[in-house]
Amino acid sequence: MSNAKQTIETGKAVLGIEFGSPRIKAVLVNETGEPIASGAHDWENRLEDGIWTYSLDDIWTGLTDCYGRLAEDVKEKYDTVITSLAAIGFSGMMHGYMAFDKDGELLVPFRTWRNTITGEAAAALTKEFSFNIPQRWSIAHLYQAILDGEEHVGNISYFTTLAGYIHWKLTGEKVLGVGEASGMFPIDAKTRDYNQTMIDKFDALVAPKGYPWKLREILPKVLVAGEAAGTLSAEGAKLLDKSGNLSAGIPLCPPEGDAGTGMAATNSVAVRTGNVSAGTSVFAMVVLEEDLKNVHEELDMVTTPSGDTVAMVHCNNCTSDLNAWVGLFKEFAEAFGMKPDMNELFGTLYRKALEGDKDCGGLLAYNYFSGEPVTGLNEGRPLFVRRPDAHFTLANFMRSHLYASLATLKIGLDILLKEEKVKVDRIYGHGGLFKTKGVGQGILAAAMDAPVAVMETAGEGGPWGMALLASYMVHKAEGETLEQYLSGKIFGGETGTVMEPDPADVAGFETYTKQ
């Protein structure tokens, strides 16, 4: 009997499931956190009545299909079935708004993080709290509904996020992991709970409306990584596994957000570490030693799954424009009768960029495929410009587009690292930009003027990170922190391939962004 089969049959495997934007993915891991099976379900949000949403049917059909595909993978690989698990954890896209009445009925369609319909509320709360409240945060959605006089608000008994909703329906527990909760409402780093001063301010703000609830009564309870968060109910087991093989009573860990699972999957939960996820969009998260001195609209304040404060820079645009140009070069090659392999094409063009001038020789790219809040743009218009005396070469062209993919991120990071003087020992890079060895990594190191590590074992991303958080709950030693557990038992001291910033690259990127 294989070790993995034995792990599954003895109920020692741990399951992580993440509801991402394009897909729901499940990862099953063994006692040492190694993935042994997976399943996925593709889904798409829809725009209905001007709201980006997923229906409840989308959510439950997606979950059961995803779990069913995981069960098929287990059957195919190990010729066995899952009847019990050591632990389960759910994560999802953070923020958004799911409001329920006293009977557990959804009051209005799920409003996802993608909606930019809460500008008035976000601005008012940011001013009231002296704390940046982005439009996608749950509290901004609630306050906007209040400002708009929406009838359902008086009937709210509970509101939560997507991961919180799934967890509630499977366990009966109205809880959230602190990282996920930090995208609903600001967290007090000392108490690892909602900021009571801000809750009091909110209650005072809406008191004239006469609603029958106080804010804390309708928010999920906050838990930190490692705490018990309920067990799978008999009804929950049926919702998850249509085959009926899965038994009730399995412990669940606190549901987390996709930011927290990304931190776990890259082993960047410790103070002075961070990670950058760079693909279609890009975001950077840095775990802080102390609170920032000022409020910055470019920076979101969230937490690690353990409740340490994290500053996040989120940009809508990263590689889309770059990918479009690579597609054009593919057409050029095909016009000459060549059939280029896309991985080879990307690799060749990315490596070519290393031959370019450090400041891109007078070439400048703006990669705004869509609107960009960090730079105040409502719509995207990708642009490429050059000075008449520019050094117009393929190397500089590629380098300028690679710089552009991280330039907006650099604007936010400069506020963090230069204005706020935040110290970072190491950043972990993951995502498509880092596939070509040493290129995207070196450019990020230049943008941040800090060492950047890329793990060989990027693992399975978010759902793997969620499985690790569930594993931590059941496998942690007495007094063992999440940071100690991940570093010692999962990553085993692996720090990945590290690139130090090249001073000439740092200076070149500075010159480029000032243009």
In which residue ranges do the predicted regions lie?
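Glycine/Thr-rich phosphate-binding loops that ligate phosphate moieties of nucleotide
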Residues: 2-41, 45-47, 57, 64-65, ...
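Residue-level preference for well-ordered alpha-helical positions
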Residues: 126, 167-168, 199-203, 237-241, ...
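Conserved phosphate-binding catalytic cores of ATP/NTP-utilizing and phosphoryl-transfer enzymes
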Residues: 2-10, 76-79, 141-148, 234-245, ...
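Gly-rich Lys/Arg/Thr-decorated short loops/hinges at beta-loop-alpha junctions or inter-strand turns
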Residues: 43-53, 124-125, 178-181, 213-219, ...
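Gly/Ser/Thr-rich active-site cleft segment
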Residues: 19-21, 32, 100, 129-256, ...
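Phosphate/pyrophosphate-binding loops at sites that engage ATP/ADP/AMP, CoA/4′-phosphopantetheine
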Residues: 63-85, 149-153, 196-215, 240-244, ...
